[in-house]
């Protein structure tokens, strides 16, 4: 029997940098649809993903309307105070077997193209650890603020994207260990790394950027 592929979209945040404190950014409209709907639909484009589980904050009254009519989609009020807590809760809520594959995708990455998603799944299914979409750093990188302290060597540096795809058992254990240790987990791959694994880097796509700042909304609309 083929192991299941389950996607998790943590959508319990508010997006404080996006310029609309009255509306969480995942519900802001892009080309006429909530950003969250675009992100979930991008995952549903690959038939190998059996289910997309969206984790929202308890009491969230917007998610139902934003996701109405989408197939293979489950919305659960299991969002936590941090991304790691939300993903861990969604993973527990899914009852996924340890051998199932979990793809975690940002609600703020609505521009995920089908070919990048397929590339990630193909690569990870053939890998012992799993991996993530990422892009090699192209710009010169400076450290400092407000003045330059140093120019960093960009050779070998990658910008992490999502989805990030790992076996449920491995991810569950890595997140639990990271939370118990009190460290900051900014993405699933960092928890996997802390557990001693080396995730695979799979080339992503420029249009799969994370909508973060007010100007990003206009830019993303050009892609959708």
Swiss-Prot record:
Q: What is its EC number?
A: 2.7.7.60
Q: In which pathway does it act?
A: Isoprenoid biosynthesis; isopentenyl diphosphate biosynthesis via DXP pathway; isopentenyl diphosphate from 1-deoxy-D-xylulose 5-phosphate: step 2/6
Q: SUPFAM superfamilies given for it?
A: Nucleotide-diphospho-sugar transferases
Write the signal peptide boundaries.
Answer: none
- Pfam families recorded: IspD
GO biological process, any = isopentenyl diphosphate biosynthetic process, methylerythritol 4-phosphate pathway
A GO MF annotation of the entry reads: 2-C-methyl-D-erythritol 4-phosphate cytidylyltransferase activity
Residues under site feature: Transition state stabilizer: 17, 25
Site-annotated residues for Positions MEP for the nucleophilic attack = 154, 210
- Asked if Transport is a keyword of the record, the answer is no
Catalytic activity reported: 2-C-methyl-D-erythritol 4-phosphate + CTP + H(+) = 4-CDP-2-C-methyl-D-erythritol + diphosphate
Q: Record's CDD domains?
A: CDP-ME_synthetase (cd02516)
Q: What InterPro entries does UniProt report for this protein, alphabetically?
A: IspD (IPR001228), IspD/TarI (IPR034683), IspD/TarI_cytidylyltransf_bact (IPR050088), ISPD_synthase_CS (IPR018294), Nucleotide-diphossugar_trans (IPR029044)
Question: What keywords sit in the KW lines?
Answer: Isoprene biosynthesis, Nucleotidyltransferase, Transferase
The record's section on Gene3D superfamilies has: Spore Coat Polysaccharide Biosynthesis Protein SpsA, Chain A
Please give the function described in this protein's UniProt entry. Catalyzes the formation of 4-diphosphocytidyl-2-C-methyl-D-erythritol from CTP and 2-C-methyl-D-erythritol 4-phosphate (MEP).
What is stated as this protein's family in its record? Belongs to the IspD/TarI cytidylyltransferase family. IspD subfamily.
State what protein this is by name: 2-C-methyl-D-erythritol 4-phosphate cytidylyltransferase
